[in-house]
A protein has these predicted regions:
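Cytochrome P450 C-terminal beta-domain/meander region
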Residues: 66-71, 223-230, 245, 250, ...
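Cytochrome P450 heme-binding "Cys pocket" and the immediately downstream C-terminal segment
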Residues: 102, 280-321
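Conserved cytochrome P450 K-helix/beta-meander segment immediately N-terminal to the heme-binding cysteine loop
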Residues: 231-259
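Cytochrome P450
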Residues: 2-18, 75-82, 146-158, 168-191, ...
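N-terminal membrane/targeting module of cytochrome P450s
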Residues: 1-26, 88-108, 133, 335
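Hydrophobic, repeat-rich solenoid/adaptor surfaces of innate immune receptors and signaling proteins
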Residues: 83-87, 163, 189-193, 227, ...
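Cytochrome P450 heme-thiolate "Cys pocket" and heme-binding signature region
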Residues: 257-287, 312-313
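Cytochrome P450 substrate-recognition site 1
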Residues: 32-52, 57-152, 176, 181-188, ...
């Protein structure tokens, strides 16, 4: 009891602070000797946690990149991380040094659950024979089931029709289309795997969408745990040294002087190199068919009294739009 009174308490507090500062100093020495790229000075114990706005990570990283350069360091607690920004540096890391940067940090929950390397799936798996085998298997299975083929296009077109019907049912109202879009995407995967789709009210489909959403959030929570290298794809998609109007939707970015489509090397929403998205052909097909179908059938507007959708993303995997409302009105034929 005596120990917790007055001077005893003070001595204990001072001892604890000195102990923490010493441990912190040991970690800092490791950082100094390892010669990390520049970055903001980390706080003892917390690292740079208070210097980044977790609710708007892309903007925080954007400001840091302008201050410290395209490759800079941050510390999450005592864990050092290197953030890579803009086309040139990202290409160098993902493509030129692809072999050295294709690994993924161990996932603590996998260890706790005793998940074996062969059961880690593709996205989070370490770069090794198990990942290679799972990736090859996934690509060939997706192809067998129709990825990149006409048969899948029919499923996606059919689903786009159902999506349009769901929009029609709520035409003229202020809606958040997220749930409908997620159900349509889940149905495409269901078409691939089960060769059938589900009605949007079907409890099974609703459960599936919820599970996918939850698992994605979990993943984003675990990624930073062991991550030392963070590839900031947003900084490539909005690279001011590459795009004419980097912060605007500007279709001319992808058109030549004659109005023909041109590919742009900085357009890499599916990443690049060995760990690039393997579902890209399917995702592109879905985006094209869903968008064209919706835009042909409806005029979209911001409902009266609602703000314009924000261009800031919600920082998860993948980055998602912040909630927004829109109003879809059925187009008159020929307009
Ligand atoms: C618009 C939709 C999509 C976007 C923007 C997207 C984006 C990405 C990105 C940026 C990565 C790299 C992640 C990393 O570096 O760790 C990735 C990986 C991956 N994506 Fe996608 N993706 C999309 C749709 C899909 C679909 C439809 C599938 C499945 C059919 C899929 C399956 C995968 C897999 C399995 C990986 C891990 C690849 C590996 O680590 O080897 N994605 N995706």
């Amino acid at each position: 009891m005596e120990l917790l009174n007055g001077t005893g308490l003070w001595s204990m507090a001072i001892f604890t602070v000195i102990f923490i500062l010493l441990v912190d100093l040991m970690h800092r020495r490791h950082r100094w000797t390892s010669r990390y790229p520049p970055g903001p000075v980390p706080w003892p114990v917390l690292g740079n946690l208070l210097q980044v706005d977790l609710s708007n990570m892309p903007y925080s990283l954007y400001k840091l990149q302008h201050r410290y350069g395209d490759v800079f360091s941050l510390q999450k607690g005592w864990k050092p991380m290197v953030i890579v920004n803009r086309l040139k540096a990202v290409q160098e890391v993902l493509v030129t040094h692809g072999e050295d940067t294709a690994d993924r940090p161990p996932v603590p929950i996998f260890k706790c659950l005793g998940v074996k390397p062969r059961s880690q799936g593709v996205i989070l798996a370490s770069y090794g024979p198990e990942w290679r085998e799972q990736r090859r298997f996934s690509v060939s299975t997706l192809r067998t089931f129709g990825m990149g083929k006409k048969s899948l296009e029919e499923w996606v077109t059919k689903e786009a029709g159902h999506l349009c019907d769901a929009f029609t049912a709520q035409a003229g109202q202020s809606i958040n289309p997220k749930a409908m879009l997620n159900k349509a995407l889940c149905n495409v995967i269901a078409s691939l795997i089960f060769a059938r789709r589900f009605e949007y009210e079907d409890p099974y489909l609703i459960r599936m969408v919820k599970l996918v959403e939850e698992s994605l959030t979990e993943v984003s929570g675990f990624i930073p745990e062991g991550t030392t290298l963070i590839i900031n794809l947003s900084s490539v998609l909005k690279d001011e040294t590459v795009w004419e109007k980097p912060h605007r939707f500007h279709p001319e970015h992808f058109l030549d002087a004659q109005g023909n489509f041109v590919k742009h090397e900085a357009f890499m929403p599916f990443s690049a190199g060995r760990r690039a998205c393997l579902g890209e052909p399917l995702a592109r097909m879905e985006l094209f068919l869903f968008f064209t179908c919706l835009l042909q059938r409806f005029s979209f507007s911001v409902p009266v009294g609602q703000p314009r959708p924000s261009t800031h993303g919600f920082f998860a995997f993948p980055v998602a739009p912040l909630p927004y409302q829109l109003c879809a009105v059925v187009r008159e034929q020929g307009l």
